[in-house]
Every structure is written in C-alpha cells, then in structure tokens.
Amino acid sequence: MSDDMSMGSPSSAGEQGVLRSMQEVAMSSQEASKMLRTYNIAWWGNNYYDVNELGHISVCPDPDVPEARVDLAKLVKAREAQGQRLPALFCFPQILQHRLRSINAAFKRARESYGYNGDYFLVYPIKVNQHRRVIESLIHSGEPLGLEAGSKAELMAVLAHAGMTRSVIVCNGYKDREYIRLALIGEKMGHKVYLVIEKMSEIAIVLEEAERLNVVPRLGVRARLASQGSGKWQSSGGEKSKFGLAATQVLQLVETLRDAGRLDSLQLLHFHLGSQMANIRDIATGVRESARFYVELHKLGVNIQCFDVGGGLGVDYEGTRSQSDCSVNYGLNEYANNIIWAIGDACEEHGLPHPTVITESGRAVTAHHTVLVSNIIGVERNEYTDPTAPAEDAPRALQNLWETWQEMHKPGTRRSLREWLHDSQMDLHDIHIGYSSGAFSLQERAWAEQLYLSMCHEVQKQLDPQNRAHRPIIDELQERMADKMYVNFSLFQSMPDAWGIDQLFPVLPLEGLDQVPERRAVLLDITCDSDGAIDHYIDGDGIATTMPMPEYDPENPPMLGFFMVGAYQEILGNMHNLFGDTEAVDVFVFPDGSVEVELSDEGDTVADMLQYVQLDPKTLLTHFRDQVKQTDLDDALQQQFLEEFEAGLYGYTYLEDE
C-alpha cells in the first residue's frame, strides 16, 4: 500500500510537478530556488501555486492544464485599478473541481488495484465552507458527489441542491423532531438520505416520524472507536468524542430496530477519527477497528451497505510532509489505499460483500482554493547606524555596553558570541531599571537601545544557521530584530484558527520572490488586541516565529497572500472590533490565458456590522446629526461632517486609501 505521491522516487504526476516547479524557478536564478525552498511552495502549493520568472506568485487552478495560469500579483493590481478593495478573498472554483476529481481518481485506482467491488462516494460536509460558490462548483463538476449536513440550516441547503446531485445525503449532528422530519421528507422525495444515529434518544423520534410520513427510514449509526488520532483536532474522535454510540449502545440500537421490525433500515456504518489526521498509521488503525464493527454488525443480521469513514484526510499546510499538526505524512493514493485495503481485507476474511465506501473529505477539497490578499499599511523596521561613544562621565552601564561593542570588533578576541549577547542584555536591563528610577535620561535610554540593536546585528552576522548550537540564538535575535508589518486585515475574522488553535497557514509576499529572503518580519493585524498577530511561519523544513522576507521598499511594501484559507476560516470568522467579511471574487483561468473575475461577496459595510449588534445605522445618523446641529460650527462644516459620517456608515470596515 505504498503511496506513489510520497517521498520516494518522483514517479507520480504530483512529485514530477514539484520537481518541474523547482527547475523552472532555478532557471531564472539561484536566489529564486533558495526562496522556493524557504517558503516550501513546491510542496504545500500542490501544483496550484508556484513562482514565475518575474518572482511573482502564479496560480494554476487545474494542474492537468498547465497552460491555464495567472500571475496573482498582476491580477490583484489590475483589480485594484478597477476599484477592488483590500483585503479580499481571491477564490479559484476550478481548484475545488480538481480536488474532487483527484480524490475520486485516487479511490478509483485503489479499488482497481485491490479488486474492490463496492462503489466510492465523496460526501462533502458543507460545514467546512457553506458558501454558494463552493457548493455549486462541486455539484456542477460532473463528478459523483454526496452532501453532508450537521444542522437544520445545513440540511435545508443540502436538500435544495440535492436535485442537482441525485446522490447521497448524510445527516449528522444533534437532531430534533424538525431536523428528522426534514430528512425523512428528503427520503420521501426520492433522495437517498441517511439519518445517522449519534444519540440513543434520536431513534424513537425517527421511528415515530417515519410512521407518520409513511416512509421507510434509511439509517446509519456512528460508532465511537477506541482509536484516536493526534494533534489539534484529536478530541473529535476516540472514546471521549462528543458524538457517537459506545459498543453497548450500538447493540441496544440493533435490538431496538429489530423489535420495531426496522433492522433493514440500518444500512450505514459511520465513524470519525478526527480532522486533519497527520499520520497515516492512525488512519489505518482506525479503519481496521471500524471494519470489525462492520463484520460484527453483519453477524447480528444487520445488512450494512455503506461504510462512512468520516473526515480526517489532511492537507500539508507546512509543506514538510511530516507528522506535525499542520502537515501530513501521506498523499491521496496512500490514503485511499489504506482505506480500501483495510475494508477489503476484512470483507474477504469473513466472506462479506464489499460495501460502498464514503469519505467526508471537506478540508482536503476546499483548503487550497482561497487566498486572502491584503496590503501592508505600516512597517516598523530596525535601522542600524554607526554608534557613537558615550560621554566620558556617562553611567557605568552605558560604558559597559560601549566596551562590549568595542571588544566585538577587536581581532583575536576569545569571548563567545553568546557571552557578548548576555553581557549586553544584562547591561540594557540595568539601564531600563535605572530609567524607571530616574537614573538615566530618555536620551541615554535611546542611545543604549540603539547600540544594543547594533550589537545584535553584529552577532547575527557571525552566526551560522548550520551550527545547531547557534540555532537558539538565531531564533532569539530574529524575533527581537524582525520588522513589524501592520497588515490591513483581522486575524479573528479571516484566519480564526491561527488565533484559536495556533494553526499555521502559508503566508508570503506576492512578488519579489526572485530575491533572497534576507529580512525577517512579524505580521500584526489592525484589531485593538495583542492576540492579533501571527506567531508561526514556514521556514524551509521547519517552523519559525518570524517570516522570511525578501528586501523591500518600506514606503511601498509588497502585498501579502495568506494561502489555504478555504476550509473553515470564512465560516468561523468572528466580528472582533466589528471588522466584517472581506470582499470576495471568483477567478476562472482558461488555457488561452484569458481570466474571468466575478464579484461573489461585496464584503460587509460598517452599517452591516452595527446592525449585527442591534445598532440601527439610521438612528445613529440621527443622533449624530442632532449633536452636530447643537454645535456653533458653520453650516458648510456641519454638512461636511454629516456627509463624512454617512459615507463611513456605508463604507468598508477595513482601512481604505484616500
């Protein structure tokens, strides 16, 4: 069950694409090749994102049609010239369709390789991203596709689109009587709707409503496994998971249905190991355990026809091909092989039919298709000047700093870089304490801090990244000396998982990528919250607390792209500081080089956000008008202030250029 997309010989289209990507950039310059390795684009980009000969990010929504690609930096600038506001989501629906085709193809290969007789369906759980562009792009792809709902609202959306798929509907989550009736209505209309029993209290309502509607229910059972994945999302699986029935409850459900004469309604077995499974071994272990449930249920006379392995198919946000929380150590082929072979082996061993396999692979379908693009509105850089000696009567701590600086430049000195750094840190600490007590002036503090920065810069130049003993010092200095970039976006609205669970997303400039990334930066959002900062960045095969950056003009910094934000982020985003949804555009790229762009979301206005918190914009305008009229300002100025207030109410919630 080896995966030809993993880290062996480059025999697969995926890995050949990675090598081709590296070679193309290497032809332009060695610097670009180094940059490509620094940001790991060749791996997390998955052939959808690359760097062109100009050092710009390019997008190829369908790697099977490599000539259909667009320069993202040029596209954003062209859109800005036409009035596009930033931040904005640039969405590529064609990537969604390619992801769906790729997953279906992987399972087709796995089934053919094993000789597996059952079907396969990818069922898209719309909770991952319920936006219309996502659902409609997938159902119009021409590929087999089912839909999954986890709430009444989601089920209504699924039922409304079900006529376009004529496939499978899976109903998960907590269910009240109305939810259950909706699902049964869908079954009555001719759809194949599986009501998955996750709590024993649900089955009585299902049987009651099925009788009232005169419909035979199509049921599933979610089994709670002992197997569990690891990482940030592990609590959604295992024995302590929020959903599912324990072994004794599964037996109780079987007997309840047998007594009601509805045992034949139980047709689907469902389990869920967790989201973003990093280690293929955890997936294989869980599928083998769940296959035992399939065997045992058949022994009890339950004719299970569908085997729903739930979610778990991860994506490599880091590009490290590892077991870390935001990466995966497997590819699509290996994932499909492990599932098909584990289920197939259990069936062959016990002489059972091969069931239809279902996966609920939402993240793997949607993550790549969306890029958040924003502008940098301010930069704070540490600049280095030639230090000057302190006054002869300067306090001892200032003299110590200066003496350390001089010693650093003497040839043949035997003190270590670490010792210089520690001495300067202690002296600076004494100066900060002394400043608080009045022993040092503001000018003396500023002089000491500037000299300390110069010393850090000098130490940094002499450190070797290949020396493991130097790595902690390098990390410390990079964090201390990194540029602060203030970016026009809300982390809480656009990348809530980066804040809430410390998830890593690829972030890099859209241009200037033909240069060596010699600077370091940290990214801060525009909310009034110290948590509004990105803490971790891709740095080669590792993760760093600062972002590598090519040299740039601080007066005209590059636009930034936040990649792989297509799963969950739009839906989970919150309204901290009343920053709302960003604008969103759908981008379609064609083989002849043409590009079509459609505005799919105008973004929230200030008025929209105020209404969310029950503040009526018209009432606010009236109150403001009353205040203005009570001033002694002249009529023209009053009118100007009123117009500005009203324009602000119906303007973008993010910062806008004049």
Curated annotation (Swiss-Prot):
It is an enzyme of class 4 (lyase). Its EC number is 4.1.1.19. It catalyses: L-arginine + H(+) = agmatine + CO2. One of its GO terms (molecular function) is metal ion binding. The keyword Lyase applies. SUPFAM superfamilies: Alanine racemase C-terminal domain-like (SSF50621), PLP-binding barrel (SSF51419). Its cofactor is Mg(2+); pyridoxal 5'-phosphate. It comes from the Bacteria. The modification N6-(pyridoxal phosphate)lysine is found at K127. Pathway: Amine and polyamine biosynthesis; agmatine biosynthesis; agmatine from L-arginine: step 1/1. Substrate binds at F307, D308, V309, G310, G311, G312, L313, G314, V315, D316, Y317. GO terms for biological process: arginine catabolic process; putrescine biosynthetic process from arginine; spermidine biosynthetic process. PROSITE patterns: ODR_DC_2_1, ODR_DC_2_2. HAMAP family: SpeA. PANTHER family: ARGININE DECARBOXYLASE (PTHR43295), BIOSYNTHETIC ARGININE DECARBOXYLASE (PTHR43295:SF9). This is Biosynthetic arginine decarboxylase. It comes from Salmonella typhimurium (strain LT2 / SGSC1412 / ATCC 700720). The lineage of its organism: Bacteria, Pseudomonadati, Pseudomonadota, Gammaproteobacteria, Enterobacterales. The gene is speA.
